[in-house]
Swiss-Prot record:
SUPFAM superfamilies: HisI-like. This is Phosphoribosyl-AMP cyclohydrolase. One of its GO terms (biological process) is L-histidine biosynthetic process. Homodimer. Belongs to the PRA-CH family. It catalyses: 1-(5-phospho-beta-D-ribosyl)-5'-AMP + H2O = 1-(5-phospho-beta-D-ribosyl)-5-[(5-phospho-beta-D-ribosylamino)methylideneamino]imidazole-4-carboxamide. Its cofactor is Mg(2+); Zn(2+). One of its GO terms (molecular function) is magnesium ion binding. It comes from Dechloromonas aromatica (strain RCB). The lineage of its organism: Bacteria, Pseudomonadati, Pseudomonadota, Betaproteobacteria, Rhodocyclales. The gene is hisI. Keywords: Amino-acid biosynthesis, Cytoplasm, Histidine biosynthesis, Hydrolase, Magnesium, Metal-binding, Zinc. PANTHER family: HISTIDINE BIOSYNTHESIS BIFUNCTIONAL PROTEIN, HISTIDINE BIOSYNTHESIS BIFUNCTIONAL PROTEIN HIS7. Binds 1 Mg(2+) ion per subunit. Binds 1 zinc ion per subunit.
């Protein structure tokens, strides 16, 4: 995605939380928010260097190279930060069109209908077929 010099100024300009994390929103080329995750310094640096989204898995306590198991990589076109420098917005191309482990286009598929959450988006591929 980009060449980095030895300066860490661009990383230090961000507001990391107490655990060294920053929220990251992934938005596809149509403007749809497809995912929310966290990044640490290592995952953000790797994302910039390799051009594919790399997050920090808080549950697995390791780098999560999006698509490493499913093949549904996220090619990063640009990275922006908000006015406070405490949230990242990744403009991505979602390879395979599936961002969610449930087999949907977006992780934001549940919609509030009255007092219930209902799935508003279809499953594009059975997760059993994605994660063999």
């Amino acid at each position: 995605m980009a060449d980095l010099d030895n300066s860490q100024d661009w990383l230090e300009a961000l507001k990391w939380d107490a655990d060294g994390m920053i929220p990251a929103i992934a938005q596809d080329e149509n403007g749809r928010v497809v995912m929310f995750a966290y990044m640490n310094r290592d995952s953000l640096q790797e994302t910039v260097l390799c051009g594919n989204a790399v997050y920090w898995s808080r549950s697995r306590k390791r780098l999560w190279r999006k698509g490493e198991e499913s093949g549904h990589f996220q090619k990063v076109n640009s990275i922006r930060t908000d006015c406070d420098g405490d949230v990242l917005l990744l403009s991505i191309e979602q390879v395979g069109g599936i961002a969610c482990h449930t087999g949907r286009e977006s992780c934001f598929f549940n919609e509030l209908n009255g007092d219930r959450w209902i799935p508003a988006d279809p499953v594009l591929k059975d997760p059993k077929e994605i994660y063999k």
